[in-house]
A protein has these predicted regions:
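Catalytic phosphate/nucleotide-handling subdomain of diverse soluble enzymes
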Residues: 40-79
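Acidic, His- and aromatic-enriched active-site or binding-groove loops in soluble protein domains
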Residues: 30-38, 43
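Short, glycine-/Ser/Thr-/acidic-enriched flexible segments
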Residues: 12-14, 71-72, 107
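A charged, amphipathic alpha-helical module
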Residues: 1-20
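Conserved active-site and cofactor/substrate-binding residues in soluble primary-metabolism enzymes
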Residues: 2, 6-7, 46-50, 209-213
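Extended hydrophobic packing segments that form well-structured cores
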Residues: 110-230
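Conserved anion/nucleotide-ligand pocket segment
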Residues: 78-107
Length: 230
């Protein structure tokens, strides 16, 4: 209708307006559907992660997950809590090192590629009142899936990228879900510190595969710096 090729929305301000409560809706599924329809779509008006998402989607022809990065400290959560009981025989075991959690209610079904079969999904609700449709996708269905992380700085001149692999995926009954857990090359804690010191901000864009080299080449062509954390 509007011929748009990108989308974002002020999620927290939207909630404060009470319009979602009145209309019983949240923007989460819109973001998921947009991305699977090849339209970069970012939460919370975060244009720094939106730029990274756009570069990654256009470059690889794959859909992109995005979310809040949270440092999970060594020994603080069991493997069962990290959504990993199917992978190991001791679900009560804990990690002896830090891992990175990424959570948001905007998973996608075309992480493998726009020309590949869609991943399976199930519908869920965002609120405790049972409204606010979004869906869950098991982002740990392939053990050890290699992924690339990306985000631009606030000036839009530099992009930090990192590589990791998937450890587990936890579905939560409400709020931002799924929560996906990743091992980061170079260390999860060190990655978070590098993001803070570099002035990069918060959300991360995640794409299947190691695409660091292609992003570096794209940066040379388009004119932005790529900082590779590892």
């Amino acid at each position: 209708k509007y011929d748009c090729n990108a989308f974002t929305t002020p999620c927290k301000e939207l909630c404060a307006s009470r319009l979602p409560q009145q209309n019983k809706c949240v923007p989460c599924m819109t973001h998921s559907l947009n991305k699977d329809d090849r339209i970069p779509s970012a939460c919370e008006e975060d244009l720094a992660v939106w730029m990274a998402m756009m570069m990654m989607m256009y470059l690889t022809r794959q859909s992109v997950f995005m979310g809040n990065p949270v440092l999970v400290l060594a020994g603080s959560k069991t493997l069962e809590q990290l959504g990993m009981p199917k992978l190991l025989t001791q679900p009560g075991q804990t990690f002896d090192h830090d891992v990175l959690e990424i959570h948001h209610a905007v998973p996608v079904r075309r992480m493998r590629g726009f020309d590949q079969p869609e991943q399976k999904y199930e519908l869920a609700h965002f609120t405790t009142q049972g409204w606010g449709a979004h869906y869950h996708v098991d982002m740990a269905e392939e053990e050890g899936q290699v992924v690339t992380f990306g985000r631009f700085n606030r000036q839009g001149t530099r992009m930090m990228v990192a590589v990791g692999h998937t450890l587990g995926c936890e579905f939560r009954p409400v709020y931002c879900s799924p929560a996906v857990y990743y091992e980061i090359e170079g260390g999860a804690r060190e990655f978070r510190q590098a993001l803070a010191k570099g002035g990069y901000g918060h959300h991360q864009a995640i794409i299947y595969g190691n695409h660091v080299k292609e992003l570096q080449e794209l940066g040379e062509i388009v004119g932005f710096e790529v900082e590779y954390f590892h």
